[in-house]
A protein has these predicted regions:
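C-terminal motif of bacterial Sec signal peptides marking the signal peptidase cleavage site
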Residues: 24-28
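Bacterial N-terminal signal peptides that target proteins for export
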Residues: 2-16
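Low-complexity, intrinsically disordered regions enriched in charged/polar residues
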Residues: 7, 19-20, 88
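N-terminal targeting/export leaders
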Residues: 2, 29-146
Length: 146
């Protein structure tokens, strides 16, 4: 083979490898989305980061700040519940942020992390009297779709 053909072939192989590596890199990158502004808790802010792991599960990490204690809402509630929507399930309770057990700090910051085998399409938070409730009440914070 001539040197020109070998160089061209080597360049094509390298370009293909870079393309494949780029696809895998973007596939494993986390998506980070901010919660929309809330009319119920106007100062509340937060983000949701969803990342696919090596086992094809999705790690869901929620960071919150300036989220008023649920007992200070009108009407007063006991806890915040985090919900997930997927293409397979309309809505699922994935956990709670309970201020009485110090999940919500004095600085009104909280974080939450869980793993799901199903990719979420939307994450939202409600204030509830019961953290094990199966259907959501009024939404406090919500994301657009992923």
């Amino acid at each position: 083979m001539s040197t020109k053909i070998q160089t061209s072939l080597t360049q094509n192989i390298l370009l293909c490898l870079i393309g494949i590596m780029t696809i895998f890199l973007f596939e494993s990158c986390a998506r980070k989305i901010a919660f929309q502004a809330s009319t119920i808790v106007p100062g509340a802010e937060g983000t949701v980061k969803v990342k696919k792991d090596n086992n094809s599960n999705y790690t869901i990490h929620v960071e919150l700040s300036n989220l008023a204690e649920p007992r200070k809402l009108e009407p007063a509630m006991k806890t915040y519940v985090i919900w997930m929507e997927t293409e397979q399930e309309p809505v699922k309770n994935i956990g709670q942020i309970n201020s009485s057990s110090s999940f919500l700090s004095k600085r009104l910051k909280a974080s939450f992390e869980t793993v799901s085998s199903i990719k979420p399409t939307r994450i939202f938070i409600t204030a509830e009297d019961d953290g094990t409730i199966q259907y959501p009440g009024t939404q406090i914070l919500t994301t657009n779709g992923f």
